[in-house]
Design a protein with these regions (language model features):
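Extended intrinsically disordered or low-complexity regions, especially N/C-terminal cytosolic tails and loops
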Residues: 1-231, 243-279
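Acidic/aromatic/glycine-rich contiguous surface patches that form carbohydrate-binding/processing clefts
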Residues: 239
Length: 279
């Protein structure tokens, strides 16, 4: 059964169960969208009323509605969005894996160890660049402590999920190596980890990735890329709408846009269009 808010009693709004035929009638009568026949009924059922019609009835925000007159128009946008996700998903997975591997290589080279506690002590030291006791250093220390907590939370989570690579080391009563930790960190968790690395490791990663060095004076361009694609990656993985970049809930650092404009010679990269992410 499908549901739609149709009846209001007093101050409350109640869900009224609707059949697929009832929802098609609602779209015709209330929304003035031409929809009929078994083929379109099947398409609406496959899309899902909420994920399909409700999700694709606007651009960016619900107040910016699309004036559909025919169900075929909605299907065209839905199909475009689905194909876009199919195109981007393998690329996003490749980027995530590559970034983790580049960072892992430099961490192992710098520390000569795969032990998380040792790496945490020796390399996650970005906080030391701030004046001792200053607000900036306190915030950096809080972030560093939060990263440690997130790593152990991720290991607990994945052990509970019976992740083989995690269970293997715990059952052997040995510490989980950094490469295995990277396998279970989400992209956001990885971004927070990277943010705490010292300048030397960050600079080495930036050079290895071939970034435009004058645009990466603080060696944080990698972090900015991680967080720029994190929300898109999550939206694609969860099959959310992406064509209008509604997934973006945080502003993209302007220095990332500037760097991309220099390298690509494409102007006005704002990440307000999905094409900017493809660049």
């Amino acid at each position: 059964m499908f549901y739609n808010y149709l009846i209001v009693f007093g101050l409350g709004v109640y869900d009224l169960p609707k059949s697929i035929d009832g929802l098609m009638r609602y779209m015709r009568v209330e929304k003035h969208i031409s929809i009929a026949g078994s083929a379109q009924k099947r398409k609406l059922r496959n899309m899902g009323y909420y994920h399909g019609y409700k999700g694709y009835r606007f651009i960016g925000k619900s107040s910016n509605s699309i004036p559909y007159t025919d169900f075929k128009e909605l299907v065209a946008i839905y199909d475009f969005d689905m194909r876009l996700k199919s195109l981007l998903y393998p690329q996003l997975m490749f980027i995530e894996t590559a970034l983790k591997n580049y960072v892992l290589e430099e961490i192992l080279k710098e520390s000569n160890s795969d032990n998380f506690n040792y790496i945490y002590t020796k390399l996650l030291t970005d906080y030391t660049r701030f004046t001792p006791g200053s607000d900036k250093q306190k915030n950096a220390i809080k972030q560093r402590l939060a990263v440690r907590d997130r790593v152990y939370s991720a290991l607990t989570r994945e052990y509970g999920n019976k992740k083989e690579v995690v269970q293997h080391f715990y059952h052997k009563d040995t510490s989980v190596p950094i490469w295995a930790i990277f396998e279970v960190l989400t992209l956001g968790e990885f971004g927070n980890f990277y943010s705490c690395l010292n300048y030397g490791v960050r600079r080495a990663v930036s050079i290895k990735l071939g970034f435009h060095q004058p645009s990466d004076s603080d060696a944080f361009l990698t972090k900015k890329i991680i967080f720029a694609i994190k929300e898109l990656r999550n939206a694609v993985a969860h099959n959310d709408v992406i064509f209008d970049t509604r997934f973006s809930r945080s502003s993209i650092d302007k220095s990332l846009s500037s760097s991309l404009e220099i390298v690509t010679r494409i102007k006005n990269i704002t990440f307000k269009s999905i094409t900017d992410y493809i660049i």
